[in-house]
Amino acid sequence: LIRRPLFSFLTPTRIFDQSFGEHLSESELFPTSGALSPFLLRSPFLRTPSWL
């Protein structure tokens, strides 16, 4: 029997339905990471300042 958390609508249900032998891909865990990563890598806020 699979028990779900009280606020299951806030979290992906795929994680709770997963069996232990099954692999979860990064795209299933973070579906927007592929779309955001080019912007995050080019973001000036994440670069080391030139005065350091």
UniProtKB/Swiss-Prot annotation:
UniProt KW keywords: Eye lens protein
Listed GO MF terms: protein homodimerization activity; structural constituent of eye lens
Signal peptide: none
Subunit text: Homodimer. Aggregates with homologous proteins, including alpha-A-crystallin and the small heat shock protein HSPB1, to form large heteromeric complexes.
Family: Belongs to the small heat shock protein (HSP20) family.
Job of this protein: May contribute to the transparency and refractive index of the lens.
This protein's name: Alpha-crystallin B chain
Species annotation: Trachemys scripta elegans (Red-eared slider turtle)
